[in-house]
């Protein structure tokens, strides 16, 4: 069964990022990032309000990014957004795992994030540290254009890419 609402959401808000291999700045080991869909935009207050039924932001505005939320609240948002679109939530936020993040893989297997296979998850989630660095440095396109190791995103000269 096709989920038309999910497809509409993905078409409007998501973008596919091609994965690849690289050596993150914090380790000497090469790591692999798998192809992944990520939101094109920061989570807006309007989207947060629709899912969480509250808006704790200090700087109000439907199209402004949500702020003043905790990391745990962001995980809860991901789970609720997953449920809204009929997807299996990624995070086990049950009381038994309070203060300890656990990942729910498909089939009900609950594992620690450091051994989780995110290809075996279905719902929305936050990017891992390795994925986040991959995005920030330009990913596969930056490797192909030989800009991946620039000091700043897009250049070694901060004046060319910042204000």
Region locations from a protein language model:
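A short, compositionally biased domain-edge/stem linker segment
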Residues: 1-9, 107-114
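Intrinsic disorder/low-complexity segments enriched in polar/small residues
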Residues: 3-6, 11, 152, 161
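Short, flexible, glycine/charge-rich loop motifs used to bind or transfer phosphoryl groups or to couple energy/partner
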Residues: 4-5, 26-28, 114-116, 151
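A short glycine-rich, aromatic-capped structural motif
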Residues: 5-57, 62-83, 135
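Functional-site microenvironments in short loops/helix caps that host divalent-cation chemistry
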Residues: 60, 71-163
């Amino acid at each position: 069964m096709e989920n038309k609402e999910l497809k509409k959401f993905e078409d409007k808000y998501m973008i596919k990022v091609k994965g690849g291999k690289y050596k993150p700045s914090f380790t000497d080991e090469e790591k692999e990032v798998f192809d992944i869909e990520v939101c094109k935009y920061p989570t807006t207050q309007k989207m947060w309000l629709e899912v969480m039924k509250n808006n704790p932001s200090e700087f109000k505005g439907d199209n402004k990014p949500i702020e003043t939320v905790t990391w745990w609240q962001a995980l809860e948002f991901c789970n609720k957004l997953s449920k809204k679109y009929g997807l299996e939530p990624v995070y086990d936020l049950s009381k038994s795992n309070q203060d300890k993040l656990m990942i729910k893989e498909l089939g009900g297997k609950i594992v620690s994030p450091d051994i989780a296979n995110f290809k075996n998850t279905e719902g929305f989630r936050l990017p891992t540290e390795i994925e986040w660095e991959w995005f920030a440095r330009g990913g596969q396109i930056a490797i192909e254009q030989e800009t991946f190791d620039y000091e700043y995103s897009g250049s070694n000269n901060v004046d060319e890419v910042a204000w």
